[in-house]
Design a protein with these regions (language model features):
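Flexible loop residues that form catalytic
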Residues: 1-5, 42, 71, 159, ...
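Histidine-acidic metal/acid-base catalytic patches
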Residues: 28, 59-62, 109-128, 134-235
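The substrate-binding groove and active-site-proximal loops of carbohydrate-active enzymes
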Residues: 9-10, 38-40, 69, 177-181
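Residue-level preference for long, well-ordered alpha-helices that form the structural scaffold
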Residues: 12, 16-19, 47, 74, ...
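A short acidic, helix-capping loop that chelates divalent metal ions and anchors anionic groups
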Residues: 4-10, 43, 208-213
Length: 235
């Protein structure tokens, strides 16, 4: 809905628009549901009121959460901004999840937890990305210590245990992830630390890792790998 970075892809559907109605028709026909709306960046000058359109459209799509990241160096202001976004989202029965990333100001699991707790909003939570957790120096044990009510959603992928040789964490995150089971991330321990109510998703952009695959084949490979991995853990 909103580009994750300047110039990035986005599909800004507006409430009661032709595009949104067509999307709803296709959702109804296919059985696909929308969980979260991406992606807001909480900068020092962020104004939640400018994104009422996003919450309105999300409500029409039946979404449950809005995802954001934090890029404000002032923790108190960042928490106030997050709280304001939670209040606006709450008017439409939506929650808000903060996703921490090593290269952002809200960089670690602790940063995200501090922000959510400081904001003090019941519909505020954390979006846990397995890659970001490990690349930011986090561990499954640290994740297990987080009150589970804050762990609203999680994104799974895999990666080598070692850091990117060129130090480019952004490119790795956006173009070079592995499907679950093809890397060395402690996915089993990460999933075990989540709440049974945590919504699981796959985030496996692999345009650098598998540029020859069509998007539908990338999606199928990721889903098949995740199914295989999750089923194996139940045995």
């Amino acid at each position: 809905m909103v580009p994750a970075s300047p110039g990035g892809p986005a599909h800004p559907l507006r409430a009661d628009s032709t595009g949104l109605r067509e999307t709803r028709h296709r959702m109804d026909d296919s059985g696909v549901r929308v969980f979260d709306l991406e992606f807001l960046t909480l900068t020092p000058d962020f104004d939640a009121r400018h994104y009422r359109w996003l919450a309105e459209a999300g409500a029409e799509l039946g979404a449950r959460r809005i995802s954001c990241c934090g890029d404000d160096p002032e923790p108190l202001r960042a928490a106030d901004t997050f709280a304001a976004l939670c209040e606006l989202a709450g008017e439409y029965h939506l929650g808000v999840d903060i996703e921490f990333m090593r290269w952002r100001q809200t960089a670690t699991l602790k940063d995200a937890l501090d922000l959510v707790q400081r904001a003090g909003k019941s519909n505020g939570g954390i979006l846990l990305d397995a890659l970001h957790l490990i690349r930011a120096g986090g561990t499954p044990a640290q994740l297990a210590a987080v009150p589970r009510r804050f762990l609203a959603s999680a994104q799974l992928c895999d990666a080598p245990a070692h850091l990117p040789a060129d130090g480019d964490f952004v490119s790795e995150s956006r173009t070079n992830r592995l499907v679950p089971g093809d890397g060395e991330l402690p996915l089993r321990e990460i999933v075990a630390a989540l709440s049974k109510d945590t919504a699981l998703a796959l985030e496996v952009p692999m345009s650098a890792y598998a540029p020859h695959l069509a998007p539908i084949e990338r999606a199928k490979r990721a889903i098949d790998a995740a199914d295989k991995l999750l089923l194996s853990w139940r045995e």
